[in-house]
Amino acid sequence: MYQLKIEGQAPGTCGSGKSLLVSALANGIGFPYECASGGCGVCKFELLEGNVQSMWPDAPGLSSRDREKGNRHLACQCVALSDLRIKVAVQDKYVPTIPISRMEAEVVEVRALTHDLLSVRLRTDGPANFLPGQFCLVEAEQLPGVVRAYSMANLKNPEGIWEFYIKRVPTGRFSPWLFENRKEGARLFLTGPMGTSFFRPGTGRKSLCIGGGAGLSYAAAIARASMRETDKPVKLFYGSRTPRDAVRWIDIDIDEDKLEVVQAVTEDTDSLWQGPTGFIHQVVDAALLETLPEYEIYLAGPPPMVDATVRMLLGKGVPRDQIHFDAFF
């Protein structure tokens, strides 16, 4: 264990082998972060004293200018090699609501939702305790150093069930391995829960859930929580590339009687497709127009989709604090 000193904060500790981000959050420190995967750069810090090892030296969250300075690092992608003194602007909103822990989990069910999207259910010994819309870092012993962030699609439960909708990324390392080794009884490790874009039940507004690709997991969790905890109408918009990528809602066990679902594709390659065609932010805009500020809005998906949707929402007058999002890098 190494000591972690952040200017203006009480000292904490860095666990051996844990990322600096996970260690800081486990100490109750409001360390800023977003994707926890090396892509967004929100967890960047300045190293004042000590040594760290980068788990992903080429992570896109660091700019070339950051690398030239030599003392800028991503907390989600480095581990401590000594006592550390760092500089970062901590914020209370990042202090974990639920304590973060590392858990061993068993794969209990794997189902194909589409040709490249799996529903994977894991079970831990203790209860599955998390907020709707949060995510976990997932690891496999067979892939040392490979850590991926996936949102839970289900809700907290005493049975210890954690469900994820995982999309195959052909150029990735974790998802292709999982698709090829998708067998019940396999062991994985979860670290979490993490994420600050969770469901807010007390706003009094209707919920609008928007997902693209693997963002379905996040959008489904928010929709499930909203239907359970409020009596307000819930809308879910989901965008795919082609009709082949579209999901059947019966396969993900979501109650369409209480939920208005709109599924769109960007490439209409099937003459039988009857849904809207276009980018999902355009479909949402056309469907809801000037009523968008009436909603509490939750969205997740690839960064270009999230960026385009946020710009559209702000342009429609939606207050920034009514928009909650996760971008999957």
UniProtKB/Swiss-Prot annotation:
It catalyses: 2 reduced [2Fe-2S]-[ferredoxin] + NAD(+) + H(+) = 2 oxidized [2Fe-2S]-[ferredoxin] + NADH; 2 reduced [2Fe-2S]-[ferredoxin] + NADP(+) + H(+) = 2 oxidized [2Fe-2S]-[ferredoxin] + NADPH. It holds the Pfam family Fer2. PROSITE patterns: 2FE2S_FER_1 (PS00197), 2FE2S_FER_2 (PS51085), FAD_FR (PS51384). One of its GO terms (molecular function) is metal ion binding. Its cofactor is [2Fe-2S] cluster; FAD. Optimum temperature is 30 degrees Celsius. Its EC number is 1.18.1.2, 1.18.1.3. Optimum pH is between 7 and 7.5. GO terms for biological process: carbazole catabolic process. InterPro entries: 2Fe-2S_ferredoxin-like_sf, 2Fe-2S_ferredoxin-type, 2Fe2S_fd_BS, Beta-grasp_dom_sf, Cbr1-like_FAD-bd_dom, FAD-bd_FR_type, FNR_nucleotide-bd, MRET. It is an enzyme of class 1 (oxidoreductase). Keywords: 2Fe-2S, Dioxygenase, Iron, Iron-sulfur, Metal-binding, NAD, NADP, Oxidoreductase, Plasmid. [2Fe-2S] cluster binds at C35, C40, C43, C76. It comes from the Bacteria. Residues 100-200 form the FAD-binding FR-type domain. Residues 2-92 form the 2Fe-2S ferredoxin-type domain. Binds 1 [2Fe-2S] cluster per subunit. Binds 1 FAD per subunit. Monomer. Carbazole 1,9a-dioxygenase complex consists of a terminal oxygenase component CarAa, a ferredoxin reductase component CarAd and a ferredoxin component CarAc. Part of the multicomponent carbazole 1,9a-dioxygenase (CARDO), that converts carbazole (CAR) into 2-aminobiphenyl-2,3-diol. It can use both NAD and NADP as electron donors, but NAD is supposed to be the physiological electron donor. This is Ferredoxin--NAD(P)(+) reductase CarAd. The gene is carAd.
